Amino acid sequence: IIGVVGSLIVVYAVGYMYGYHKHRKDVRDNRRYFFMLLFIFLGAMFGFVLSESLMWIDFFWEVTSVCSFLLIGYTREAEAIRNSFRALWMNLLGGVALAVGIVYFDSAVNCVSLHKLIEYAQTGVVPAVIGVALIALAALTKAAQLPFSTWLMGAMVAPTPSSALLHSATMVKAGIYILFRLAPAMGGTTTGNVVVFVGGFTFFMASIMAISQSDGKKVLAFSTISNLGLMTACAGVGSHETV
């Protein structure tokens, strides 16, 4: 998704941003800055999915959060700035939960391996179970699950390539990715049940909101959130079949 869809979005953005600034004279033409953010964002996403160390996962997580903040606020308009800060604090809230989970697990077992975290959690080691719960909470914010989905709607004010990158391509998938990585440790647990409930509720509510919209971008956003909710619920079940 990152390499193929992300690359296609970047190629599309070349022509789109040319036309965008041709028609939006009120927005400062800073395309080099825009594309720099896109490439940093994609690089951070690659680092996120390829990392086994929880420390590196946390680092790349925060890089994507900062990039999304800057991309949403690209136009420097009042609405864009307001929505960019909303996205920032919601994603940083998840980042705090992720960091606390990692630090707590590391302080207890002296390990920052995601694989080891899952292994320990499956055997019922308390620090690992708590770590999984906190990281799952962080993933729910990144995956735009209710009630954390408002930042995703606010991303609509950004130029289409960045909103597409944030919506349908990569950033929200980071939360889904980490939930699926944690799925073996969540099956049949309280954390898993909470994730299933949040995902199912998001799927149902976002589906209703999607069919009631008349704006194409909002239909895309709510339908994306709905499908993310379905994937979240499947990850929470934790069985091989649902994954």
Task: Say what each PLM segment does.
Residues 1-243:
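...captures the hydrophobic TM-helix bundle architecture rather than a specific catalytic motif
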